[in-house]
Amino acid sequence: NPSADQNQALRFAAEGGHIEIVIALLKDKRTDPNAYQSEALRSAAEYGHVKVVIELLKDKRTNPCSFDNSAIRWAAQYGRTEVVKVLLADKRVDPSANKNEAILLAAENGHLEVIKVLLRDKRVDPNEALLKAKECNRPQIVEFLLLDTRITQKTKNN
């Protein structure tokens, strides 16, 4: 049974980037891609397995917003720019979820390319990310964010 142990087979295959196994498991209707708060998608996003993320999103049962949009937050945290792009192409994904945590994590960890991609979405607020970049001594990110017209004067002065 592929759904045994909260779909452990799918979760491990996704984490390892084993695309063929993921595809085979998703063909079985007993497989639940949302099991364990969509850990399969979160893990694929965290480890940068773009093809696995794409396959999981093709399956209508996959909820990319599960666990407060954790897939995009984890992809941003670990600098997985291509995964962030794929997730943003899905209209269900909210990059501003959980108080703009995706861009905050990208700023904290120095992932400028991820920040550039996230800021294409008008729902993302760069103000707290600027403060986080200052706090974490990320001068390149600070310089980039200061160019964004959404940055308030109050944030600039902090």
Language-model segments: which ranges?
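Ankyrin-repeat boundary/"N-cap" motif
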Residues: 3-11, 34-42, 65-73, 96-104, ...
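Conserved ankyrin/ankyrin-like repeat signature
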Residues: 20-21, 51-52, 82-83, 113-114, ...
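Ankyrin-repeat C-terminal turn/loop position
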Residues: 29-31, 60-62, 91-93, 122-124, ...
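Ankyrin-repeat-protein effector appendages
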Residues: 121, 131-158
